[in-house]
Amino acid sequence: MAFTFPPSYRTLVGLYYIFTLMHTAVSTPPDDPVKCVSGNTNCTVTNSYGAFPDRSTCRAANVAYPKTEAELVSVVAAATQAGRKMRVTTRYSHSITKLVCTDGTEGLFISTKFLNHTVQADATAMTMTVESGMTLRQLIVEAAKVGLALPYAPYWWGLTVGGMMGTGAHGSSLWGKGSAVHDYVTEIRMVSPGSVNEGFAKIRILSETTTPNEFNAAKVSLGVLGVISQVTFELQPMFKRSLTYTMRNDSDFEDQAVTFGKKHEFADFIWLPSQGKVVYRRDDRVAVNTSGNGLFDFLPFRSQLSAAIAIIRTSEETQERFRDANGKCVGATIISSTLFAPSYGLTNNGIIFTGYPVVGSQNRMMSSGSCLDSLQDGLITACAWDSRIKGEFFHQTTLSVPLTQVKSFISDIKSLVKIEQKSLCGLELHYGILMRYVTSSPAYLGKETEALDFDITYYRAKDPLTPRLYEDFIEEIEQIALFKYNALPHWGKNRNLAFDGVIRKYNNAPAFLKVKDSYDPKGLFSSEWTDQILGIKGNASIVKDGCALEGLCICSKDAHCAPAKGYLCRPGKVYKEARVCTRVDGIISVI
C-alpha cells in the first residue's frame, strides 16, 4: 500500500524525532505517585500514566516511607496490630493494573522509595543483595562497579526490584533460565504480618535451597505475601553484546518467530503488520574484550519536548475524531522509518551511530530510560507519557502466547490485516508490536511454558465512552490470544478482561494460595483487585454500559459498546467466538 505524505505532518513528525535524537539530558523527572492532603495523611496513589484501567481513584489514610528494614518491620507490625489493609508503592509506579491499590480509605501505603541501597556485593561469589526499592538502573550500575552483570531484564530501567518481582517482569531470551528477572534471584527477605508473640511482624528469609515452596511463591507475589525487603541476585561476569537490527517483509514471519529465539540469545521483534514488515533484533553475547563501547539509549525513553508531544497527541485525537485511517498509516510509516534509521537510539560510542553491529557492555546495552535521569525544568520536557502534560495516553495489551501456538496466532493477525490493511496502523504509531521471548519458570505465578510475549500499545481516549478507530480488530487479537491460544497476561499490564479466570491457567495456583493464607491469613496485604485476579472473590470484569470500550468487559450486548455512535457488539471476523465493538455502517456517519 502506498500512502501520500502530507508535508505538514511529515515536517511535524520529522522535527519531533530530530529533537528527540538531539535531546537526551534535560527533562522533568516523573512525579511521586503518592499524593497526600496533609503530610503523610489522606493520600491517593496513581500510576505513572495517571489512570488505572477502570479510572478509579485509589486512597489510603496514610503513607509510610521506611528507610531501613527495622523501620519497615515497625510499620508492618503497627498496621497488623490495628488490622489495617496495606499495599506497597514504588518510586515511579509503572504498573498499569491496580496492584498498588488498597481497599477503602483507611488503609496504608508502604512506599519503598527510600529502601534503595546495596546491602552487599560479592564479586567472588557473583552475588549482590539490594533493597527492594532499588531501580533496575541502580542495580545495573552497582553490579557493573564490581564487574558483574544481570543477564536479562526489562528494557525500561525505571522499574524497582520489588516491582519486577511482584509482576514477573522480563526481558527477551529462551536461553539459560530465561528472561525473567525473578529466576536470577537466590534469596528473598520479606516482612509479613506476624502473630502477637512475633510482635505482629515477621521477617521471612526465603531461598530455593531452604524454603523452595515459599520461595517459588514469593518470586512473583503480586504483593499479597508481604513487603519484600531485600533481594539477592545471582549475577554473571560482565560480558558484551553485539546487536544488529534488520528490517524485512513479514512473508515468512510465522516460521521465523518460532525459531529465531533459539539462534540469538537476546532476540526480539518489532512487528509492523499493516506495513507488512518486521524488525529483527540479532543480539548475541560476545567476549568482554571484544572491541566496542556501544550504548543503547532507546529513543522513545528519552526526554521529550512537552509542546511537541502535545502536538502529536492532538494529531492522534484528530485522526480518531475524523476516522482518518490514512493519516494514522502515514504517521506510522514515518515513525517506524525514523526510529529504524538511527537504530532506535543505539550508538557505537555513546554519541553517534556509525553502523552495525553495535558492540557494547551489558550494562550499557540492556536497558534505558534517560528521561528519568534529569533535573527539574518546569515540564518543558518530560517522559512522553507523563500525566502532567498532554502526552501519550494508551492501552497496553501484553500477552504471552505459547511458542507452539505462535505460528497460528501470527497467521490469524495477518488474516485480520488482509480484511483491512489500515486496521493496525494505530498501534504502529506506538512503535509496533514488541515481541519478546520468555520461558517456563518455577515461580508459581510465573510463565508456564516457552512463549512469545506480544506487547501491543494503542490509543486510549480521555473520555472512556469514546470508541476507537478499528477497535474491533485489536479487541479480536486480544481475545484470540487469551481464549483461542490460552495466552497469559502480564500481571502489571493489560485491561480488566484479560484477568477473568486467569488463575486457572496456572498449575501451581493452589500452592501459591496456600502460602498466601499462611503468610497473611487475614488478607491485610490483599485487595479487591488481587482477590479478583487470584480467583478468591469476584471478577475483574466490570459490566456496565460502554464497558467493552476500555476492556472492562467483553461485550455481550450493544449497550456494552457505543450504539449511539455506531459501535455495536458483533462476532469477530476471523475468530467467530470473539465479541467485539464494531462500527456498523449506516448507524451513524461520524463519531
UniProtKB/Swiss-Prot annotation:
Signal peptide (residue range): 1-27
GO terms, molecular function: D-arabinono-1,4-lactone oxidase activity; FAD binding; L-gulonolactone oxidase activity
A Gene Ontology biological process term: L-ascorbic acid biosynthetic process
PROSITE patterns: FAD_PCMH
Keywords noted in UniProt: Ascorbate biosynthesis, FAD, Flavoprotein, Oxidoreductase, Signal
Signals that turn on the gene: Up-regulated by methyl jasmonate.
Cellular component annotations (GO), alphabetically ordered: membrane
Keyword Plastid: no
InterPro entries: ALO_C, FAD-bd_PCMH, FAD-bd_PCMH-like_sf, FAD-bd_PCMH_sub1, FAD-bd_PCMH_sub2, FAD-linked_Oxidoreductases_BP, GULLO2-like_C, GULO_Plant
Keyword Oxidoreductase: yes
EC number(s) recorded for this UniProt protein: 1.1.3.8
Gene3D superfamilies: 3.30.465.10, 3.30.70.2520, Uridine Diphospho-n-acetylenolpyruvylglucosamine Reductase, domain 2
FAD-binding PCMH-type domain span: 56-238
Reactions it catalyzes: L-gulono-1,4-lactone + O2 = L-ascorbate + H2O2 + H(+)
Cofactors demanded by this protein: FAD
Record's function text: Catalyzes the oxidation of L-gulono-1,4-lactone to ascorbic acid. L-gulono-1,4-lactone is oxidized to hydrogen peroxide and L-xylo-hexulonolactone which spontaneously isomerizes to L-ascorbate.
Protein family (similarity comment): Belongs to the oxygen-dependent FAD-linked oxidoreductase family.
Name of protein: L-gulonolactone oxidase 2
